């Protein structure tokens, strides 16, 4: 891991004709996994989170990784990297429904606003830009400032509100995406400049799926006892049984997994039923809203063997490849936190390929 300039590029790097990607707010590398290797190579990644960077370096040991706040990046440093593609997923907390929605007044917006001041001064601006954030970002003053920078810089931008279920993945994770190309490049499906609204359907040339796959395909096929560490404890069953979002192996959807999954209960993600649905319906006849369950009902709830999805399963639902790994010393709670802050690799990968549809043609 590097906190400075990293290793110098070699002659072989100079001969590599693939597009150069700069990954800002790189997290655990979701954007990197999403970039098509035949068209792109990530020349640098930047993030301030040490735990995320340890995971990134564990999966991409050869990539130049800068342990820095994006706010510290200068125009000179960005120009030296010569990125053709800029990907970024800025902090979402200023725009979430659960937060205070302080928008640009939130200190966590400072690094992105600083970047917006630097971008217009670049001598070598990126040709392609992809940004991901939560629903709510699209109505913020921060987004308005971002779109102003794109327009003034000669970019053509398309905006989307998309969820993985539209791509066949059984997980709801509605996110805002902005794709931008520098003039004179245009989007093949719509050659106009910045759209006036967010599209809620994927681009026409992106493969959609009307029926998501079943959860079974994403579960760890292990002995049931091996997941005993993930069973919901009695304190959760007794207090929160009524508000749980419960899925089973045949389900075609799960709720969005957040960084609080496994620690908090309400609104952080679905849990998995390891018994029959008939048994679940019978047991839940005795579960009352907003009331702690009686001992006999708690005993019945235990028979459902409700458990959290494992970090491996959450990673699969986020479409990380099977060879994605966390450092072995990282605890489950931290793995959930990192996944909750990451991007869906399938959705981003489809959009990047759409963004780069004019490359290599």
Task: Annotate the PLM regions.
Residues 2-126, 135-141:
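Core alpha/beta nucleotide-donor-binding catalytic domains of modification enzymes
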Residues 34, 55, 114, 145, ...:
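Amphipathic alpha-helical segments that form well-ordered structural scaffolds
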Residues 14-17, 57, 170, 248-250, ...:
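Intrinsically disordered, low-complexity regulatory regions enriched in Ser/Pro/Gly/Thr
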């Amino acid at each position: 891991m590097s906190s400075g300039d990293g290793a110098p590029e070699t002659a072989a790097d100079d001969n590599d004709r693939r597009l150069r990607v700069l990954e800002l707010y790189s997290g655990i590398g979701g954007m990197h996994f999403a970039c098509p290797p035949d068209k792109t190579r990530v020349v640098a990644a930047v993030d301030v989170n040490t735990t995320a960077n340890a995971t990134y370096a564990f999966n991409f040991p050869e990539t130049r990784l800068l342990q820095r706040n994006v706010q510290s990046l200068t125009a000179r440093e960005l120009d030296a990297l010569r990125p053709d593609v800029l990907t970024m997923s800025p902090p979402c907390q200023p725009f979430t429904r659960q937060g205070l929605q302080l928008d640009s007044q939130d200190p966590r917006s400072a690094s992105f606003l600083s970047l917006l001041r630097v971008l217009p001064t670049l001598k070598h601006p990126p040709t392609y830009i992809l940004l991901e954030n939560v629903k709510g970002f699209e109505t913020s003053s921060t987004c308005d400032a971002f779109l102003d920078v794109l327009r003034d810089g000669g970019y053509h931008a398309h905006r989307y509100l998309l969820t993985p279920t539209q791509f066949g993945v059984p997980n709801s994770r509605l996110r805002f995406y902005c794709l931008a190309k520098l003039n004179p490049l245009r989007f093949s499906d719509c050659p106009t400049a910045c759209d006036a609204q967010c599209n809620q359907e994927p681009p026409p040339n992106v493969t959609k799926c009307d029926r998501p796959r079943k959860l079974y395909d994403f579960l760890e096929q292990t002995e049931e006892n091996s997941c005993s560490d993930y069973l919901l404890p009695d304190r959760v069953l007794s207090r929160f049984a009524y508000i749980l979002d419960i899925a089973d192996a045949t389900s075609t959807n799960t709720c969005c997994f957040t960084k609080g999954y496994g620690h908090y209960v309400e609104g952080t993600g679905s849990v998995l039923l390891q018994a029959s649905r008939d048994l679940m319906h019978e047991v839940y006849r005795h579960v009352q809203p907003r009331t702690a369950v009686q001992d006999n009902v708690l005993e019945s709830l235990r028979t459902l063997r409700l458990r959290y999805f494992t970090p491996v399963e959450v990673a699969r639902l986020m479409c990380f490849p099977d060879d994605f790994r966390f450092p072995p010393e990282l605890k489950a709670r931290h793995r959930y936190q990192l996944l909750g802050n990451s991007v869906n690799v399938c959705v981003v990968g489809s959009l990047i390929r759409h963004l780069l549809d004019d490359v290599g043609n």
